[in-house]
Amino acid sequence: MDGFYEKAQQSAEYILSHSTLRPTCGIVLGSGLGSLVDKMTDKTIIPYADIPHFPRSTVAGHAGNLVLGTLAGQTVAALQGRFHYYEGFTMRQVTYPVYVLRLLGVRTLVITNACGGIDRGLAPGELMLLSDYINMLGSNSLMGPNDERFGPRFPDMTEAYSLRLRALAKSAAAELGIACKEGVYAIFPGPCYETAAEIRAYRALGADAIGMSTVPETIAANYLGLEVLGIACITNMATGIAERKHSHEEVLAVANRASADLCRLVERVIEKL
């Protein structure tokens, strides 16, 4: 083995040595969605750069902090910034924080992202619960040697996104008056945006939204035995559907505007756990 388990243990031990909190819920915050940490109390903020073996965020809108604290009565660990395959990270590096969260004691993982809408029934600024995913990366975050201390060689993905958590999220959205649809999320390697022809192909495969993250973490979390909820913030319509060219600035601007609804929804879901 390559010492991956031991490295994750060292990361977890460092984090636990800096806080008395023991999180049971983890949150991955996508582009422009890091403001949820403002709602947390009793916070301990640990920069990724300080944690042994942790990768470093390089994309605008990803602060690069692990935040331990209390939210809606639950002890949570929030990843304020994620790692993407297109940044040149290996799949192990992209998903490394999820393994560390598991060793911290996390059993429920809420993954958020900013993505493009393929379903014309979606609109920028709306939220979509992930019901399933389509992995078109040509790679999988579990490839390589398997360590049974983490999970099985061949994990099942029948319910990649928990039916129980999706029901909680639908109930929470209804209570808060937040429009929240459900759909299939497809991952695209990036960093360039998709072509119109690619979007037509993804639509034919059944994708409702598309982005450059989330699926590797989802796979790793299921492998580790975590219950997963995925929430996408639609920041733009996909190529061939949108009337103008895409930019990361546009994504961040819409994500920032929609972050209030996302924060309210995540907070209410965590309250219901």
Protein language model regions, located:
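Metabolite-binding pocket within alpha/beta catalytic cores that recognizes anionic/polar moieties
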Residues: 1-157
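Generic non-transmembrane alpha-helical segments
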Residues: 14, 18, 164, 168-178, ...
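Non-catalytic positions within long, well-ordered alpha-helices that form the structural scaffold/packing
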Residues: 102-105, 203, 222
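Short acidic/polar active-site loop segments enriched in Thr and Asp
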Residues: 107-108, 208, 227
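Metal-dependent peptidase/peptidase-like ectodomains
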Residues: 146-185
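Active-site/ligand-binding-proximal alpha/beta "capping" segment
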Residues: 172-208, 273
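Zn-dependent metallopeptidase/amidohydrolase metal-coordination segment
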Residues: 212-250
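His/Asp/Glu-rich mid-to-C-terminal helical/loop segments that flank catalytic regions of hydrolases
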Residues: 239-273
